[in-house]
């Protein structure tokens, strides 16, 4: 492109671009990046738009102290390119945010993706033209794109909940959201800091801030089960072994339950003696909490088996935390272990043995308001210089519902999803032709390795588009009865497990007014792949083409 052409493009962007495309990808996280790469490889005229100023999705936004992936780095990476697998070398078993973000940028540079991404651009409305069989997408920069296919790579954890505590706007100190952490350094030294929330983000933030702050107050409503991460540098010989055997390891991972290479046992908990159970759990605790998920086959279907493991972890909390009352308050009860996304921590419980850390139990003494100088509970006011809100996300459906999406006949997505997210295979919806979802609700989403799931979703979607183009088909949507059958399957499978019994972001219980449903397919990534492949092999069974 010459300078004159670039100037014309810049001018168009300033006034809002008008462009007709084959495909528009919304989001440039790991799902959107791969979707852009695949679509370009098919010869489509494709563009991606991204609200952030760089690639990486959740790893662009989540820069909070201690941010780290709880999936092993050798698994949490693309498998479609052996060149990328061989050139990139992970430094730790569980990679931190800066390294994952650097990896995303490395992939984007290797594949030259950024030339087809508009950064700093957020979709505000997406409307289907029934007659023209295309989508019209408007953005917050005044752009208007028309696309035959719209690929939603908005991510399941990309809309942080906002602080809705009265008085937040009058706080005189620093206030940060973990999910929208600033890009400039934040200093904790010498400051009184409050962390609100003890889910995955809060559990990672607390140990880092505790080491630096003058005093840290941790405001906890519901205690979380968290297991030791036991992170460590990756040995070069081990990395070399993995790289040599990546093809076989990836094949196993793609057809596994979660998309990883760790072993999953087929033995029920009560099939082994109490002594053997104790030995296995102690080994898992000392090696890495991640190993707990594969110890026994019935931890999420048998409440009694689940309680055995939960009691073991409760005992560990009592061992680690010196003060018995603090240990009691940190101990989760009333919901099954692993029914909420399991957390892996680095010295989380140990942080509460520090003299500069105070646990605030919001069940016993709830937060009433934020004041100019701190946080007022029912019984006291805690004065702080900084508040960090680690209060979670409007997960799975929040990102798509934040856009004004209207399908056939002007029907809105908000109407369709009024009772919770629904789709066919988590990929296609009735009433929204040529709108494809990547890692959204109704697939394995939160229970699988997101990157391998993204690859599978994108491959299936792009294969479907190729099928349409080869056969002169203009539009595709899910058949109503196929969507109904899939949702029944998702609901019935979930109902056989312990997942729906806990108040979690899986079910939407963390967002006031959100429908309480469990929309995630729990049959595993491998079985999900088979179902999707079978549907494609049957001429895309469950879909209606025109």
What are these regions (language model features)?
Residues 2-23, 28, 33-168, 173, ...:
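N-terminal FAD-binding dinucleotide-binding subdomain shared by FAD-dependent oxidases/monooxygenases
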Residues 182-188, 193-196:
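A conserved hydrophobic secondary-structure block that centers on an alpha-helix together
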Residues 206:
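Ligand/cofactor pocket segment of small-molecule handling proteins
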């Amino acid at each position: 492109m010459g300078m004159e052409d670039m100037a014309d493009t810049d001018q168009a962007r300033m006034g809002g671009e008008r462009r007709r495309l084959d495909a528009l990808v919304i989001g440039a996280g790991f799902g959107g990046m791969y979707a852009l790469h695949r679509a370009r490889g098919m010869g489509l005229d494709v563009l991606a738009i991204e609200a952030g100023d760089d690639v990486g999705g959740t790893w662009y936004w989540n820069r909070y102290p201690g941010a780290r992936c709880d999936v092993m780095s050798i698994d949490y990476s693309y498998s479609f390119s052996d060149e990328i697998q061989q050139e990139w070398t992970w430094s730790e078993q569980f990679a931190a945010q800066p390294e994952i973000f650097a990896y995303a940028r490395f992939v984007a540079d290797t594949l030259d993706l950024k030339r087809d991404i508009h950064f700093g651009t957020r979709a505000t409305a997406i409307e289907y033209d029934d007659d023209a069989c295309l989508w019209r997408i408007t953005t917050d920069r005044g752009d208007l794109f028309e696309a035959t296919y719209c690929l939603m790579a908005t991510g399941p954890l990309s809309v942080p909940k906002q602080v809705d505590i009265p008085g937040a706007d009058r706080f005189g100190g620093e206030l940060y959201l973990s999910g929208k952490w600033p890009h400039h350094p934040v200093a904790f030294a010498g400051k009184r800091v409050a962390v609100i929330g003890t889910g995955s983000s809060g559990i990672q933030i607390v140990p880092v801030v505790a080491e630096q702050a003058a005093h840290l107050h941790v405001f906890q409503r519901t205690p979380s089960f968290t297991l030791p991460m036991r992170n460590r540098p990756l040995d070069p010989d081990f990395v070399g072994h993995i790289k040599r055997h990546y093809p076989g390891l990836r094949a196993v991972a793609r057809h596994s339950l979660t998309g990883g290479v760790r072993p999953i046992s087929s033995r029920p908990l009560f099939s082994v003696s109490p002594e053997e159970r104790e030995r296995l759990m102690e080994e898992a605790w000392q090696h890495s909490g991640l190993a707990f998920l594969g110890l026994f086959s019935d931890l999420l279907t048998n409440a009694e088996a689940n309680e055995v493991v939960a009691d073991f972890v409760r005992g560990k909390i009592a061992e680690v935390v010196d003060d018995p009352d603090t240990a009691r308050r940190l101990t989760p009860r009333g919901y099954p272990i692993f029914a909420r996304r399991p957390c892996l921590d680095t010295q989380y419980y140990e942080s509460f043995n520090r003299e500069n850390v105070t646990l605030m139990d919001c069940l016993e003494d709830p937060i009433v308001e934020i004041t100019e100088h701190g946080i007022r509970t029912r019984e006291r006011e805690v004065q702080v210089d900084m508040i960090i809100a680690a209060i979670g996300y409007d997960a799975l459906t929040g990102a798509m519902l934040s856009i004004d999406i209207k399908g056939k006949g002007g029907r809105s997505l908000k109407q369709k999803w009024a009772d919770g997210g629904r789709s066919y295979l988590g990929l296609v919806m009735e009433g929204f032709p040529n709108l494809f979802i990547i890692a959204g609700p109704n697939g394995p989403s939160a229970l699988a390795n997101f990157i391998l799931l993204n690859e599978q979703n994108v491959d299936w979607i792009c294969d479907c588009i190729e099928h349409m183009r080869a056969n002169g088909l203009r539009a595709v949507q899910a058949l109503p009865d196929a969507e109904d059958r899939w949702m029944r399957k998702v609901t019935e499978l979930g109902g056989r497990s312990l997942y729906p019994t806990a108040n979690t972001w899986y079910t939407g219980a963390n967002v006031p007014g959100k429908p309480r449903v469990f929309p995630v397919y729990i049959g595993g990534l491998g079985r999900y792949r088979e179902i999707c492949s079978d549907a494609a092999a049957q001429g895309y069974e469950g879909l209606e083409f025109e």
